[in-house]
UniProtKB/Swiss-Prot annotation:
UniProt family annotation: Belongs to the V-ATPase E subunit family.
Pfam families hit by this protein: vATP-synt_E
Gene Ontology molecular functions: ATP binding; proton-transporting ATP synthase activity, rotational mechanism; proton-transporting ATPase activity, rotational mechanism
InterPro entries per UniProt: ATPase_E_C (IPR038495), ATPase_V1_Esu (IPR002842)
Coiled-coil residue spans: none
Function: Produces ATP from ADP in the presence of a proton gradient across the membrane.
Superkingdom of origin organism: Bacteria
UniProt entry tagged with the keyword Transport: yes
Keywords: ATP synthesis, Hydrogen ion transport, Ion transport, Transport
GO BP, sorted A to Z: proton motive force-driven plasma membrane ATP synthesis
Protein name as it appears in the record: V-type ATP synthase subunit E
GO cellular component, one term: proton-transporting two-sector ATPase complex, catalytic domain
Length: 198
């Protein structure tokens, strides 16, 4: 019986040893899995934080860029408004020329156009006192003295503020103040911008 007890005891001891070994193996495996999962979670966390930081920087840069662009556009719009105001004031100054200066502008402009003497000068109703019959007669006499026809006529139906339009056989040459300033605007805008904002 003692052999049986020894054998039973040995089996129980072996089983206990095997159990301890299996439990130790399982514990080691558990620790290994937990460590691996913890490391993976830590790496994932770092990756997520890095991506979030990159996305935040990109978003921040985009917001700053959009804000700068918006400010730039607002400044350009404000500058353009100021420049437009300057050109509009120039038109107003031309519209407020004295009668003598206004006539001088018209006469010097007409002299530069090489008139045939049969054209129609279109003016607005407001300027009819400046361009009287005496003015027209003097202009036609001057043209006749140059060997041209002296039959220029006036049309007071212009829908513009200041200046005139010369109609030569249906072809109109626009010498209104608005047209004059607008034709010069492209050339002068850069210079006006420099004077105003530099």
């Amino acid at each position: 019986m003692s052999n049986l007890n020894n054998l039973t005891s040995k089996i129980l001891n072996d089983a206990e040893e095997k159990k301890k070994y299996i439990l130790a193996e399982a514990e080691a495996q558990k620790d290994k899995i937990i460590s691996k999962k913890t490391n993976r979670a830590e790496a994932d966390k770092e990756e997520i934080i890095t991506k979030a930081n990159i996305e935040a920087e990109v978003k921040k840069a985009r917001i700053i860029s959009n804000a700068k662009l918006s400010v730039r556009n607002d400044m350009l719009r404000a500058k353009q408004d100021v420049i437009s105001k300057v050109f509009n004031e120039a038109i107003e100054k031309l519209q407020n020329l004295s009668n003598g200066d206004y006539k001088y502008y018209v006469i010097s402009t007409l002299d530069s156009l090489e008139l045939e003497g049969t054209e129609v000068i279109i003016i607005n109703e407001k300027d009819k006192d400046i361009f009287s019959n005496e003015f027209l007669e003097a202009l036609n006499k001057e043209l006749e003295s140059k060997g041209k026809k002296g039959s220029i006529t006036l049309n007071m139906e212009g829908k513009f503020n200041g200046g005139f339009i010369l109609d030569r056989n249906g072809i109109q040459i626009n010498n209104t103040f608005e047209a004059l300033i607008n034709s010069l605007r492209g050339e002068l805008e850069f210079e006006v911008n420099k004077v105003l904002f530099d």
